[in-house]
Amino acid sequence: AHALQESNFRPDAVSPAGARGLMQVRPGTAGDLIRWRGISGDPGRLTDPVNNIEFGQTYLEYVRDLPSTGGLLPRVIASYNAGPAPIAEWNSRFDQSDPLLFIETIPYWETRGYVPIVLRNYWIYEQLGADESPSRRALVAGLWPRFPGMAGPTAVRIDPRRPQTAMGRD
């Protein structure tokens, strides 16, 4: 879902910011991931699809595990695009109880557009695989969908009176 939006599946894509490859990973981010996560990829070969996807997936897992995203899918997607620091700031400035309101109030116009497009891409892939979409059902119900494959409930409701706590939903 990210690779479609980031590069339209072009392994040689390069952004104005210097991000490269299918998942549009910047060389500095790749170097950080080697230090932080101990992966064995080569930051000098970001146009190699296998190498690039390893870095991109590892970065998704990294931002998934940050306290600022809490593993919540819209926040993880936003963090992949905007970086982790803005997400922490937005969490403290905006009501966190409604995930759709979070998406619509993202101050960066690029990221505000990016999140629903990546979600749409993800849902299309789910549908092609004949899978139900827990994340889509969660958003319709006003719940925060969690990053796929995480242990525990597939979605949570954030208590607006205590934004750091979440109530699980299966």
Name what the model sees in each region.
Residues 1-169:
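Catalytic glycan-binding domains that act on GlcNAc-containing polysaccharides
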